[in-house]
């Protein structure tokens, strides 16, 4: 739970939630759970979420947030999983995994890019460079754009272009009430 207490959730409720997702819900007993819970930083890679919701769109995220809220579960969110501190995963939490939300599009006329939360910096850089654009962002290619932006987005172009977050035009967020 959010308070750290161990809580029980009926198996039928977990099964119903799993069926509602377009991708998978992983539990510790599920194949690939241990592979999917891992983070980039091995020093912070000892946390065990209660479940991993592999989301592919906003509707999946809404379902995961609503399930977590209904069951008083702590929520951890992972985009690229690059964060050094390991905060993208928490013991006993529902891990909302955004890594499969990786759609990216560019608007050459507006000179903008639209990226889902699971897009990695290497993908954004490649997409921008194909159109003669540059993204004011960091230099570590496996950093997720969502986490980079949430942290401000320090990068090599910031003196000329500002932080990544300075160039953010809009976001779609899911609040605690779904």
Q: Where do the protein language model's features map onto the residues?
A:
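N-terminal accessory segments
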Residues: 1-154, 159-160, 167
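Active-site and channel-lining beta-strand-loop segments
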Residues: 104, 163-178
